[in-house]
Amino acid sequence: EISAALSSIRKAYPSMKLTAAFQPHLYTRTRDFAEEFAQALSNVDKLILLDIYPAREEPIPGVTSEIIFKDVTAPHKVLLKKEELMDYMKGIELGEKEVFVTVGAGDIDRFVGPIGELLKTKA
């Protein structure tokens, strides 16, 4: 799903750079699909990887967003706690020819409005 979404965005905006903020959902999914997530996320120009949204799950020892992050080959990548996202976004430089997307099934959607408003002030 992530790979298909990012590929579609690339096709829609072929001359633009792609920046993605991704929040993994569930410890079990992160554990089971870390390699696939890393491969899909390596196709962006800049990656902001957030901590795992646990939903109903308890943490699994050794399962953090780091297991995805270490295998991502995107040219620029950063690992953040979701509480750090807005401060990070205040300092990020996005070019005119850049698309920014949020991806995830956790609570990353609550950042869409604030990020959009922030990016408008930078335009």
Describe the function of each predicted region:
Residues 1-123:
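ATP-dependent carboxylate-amine ligase
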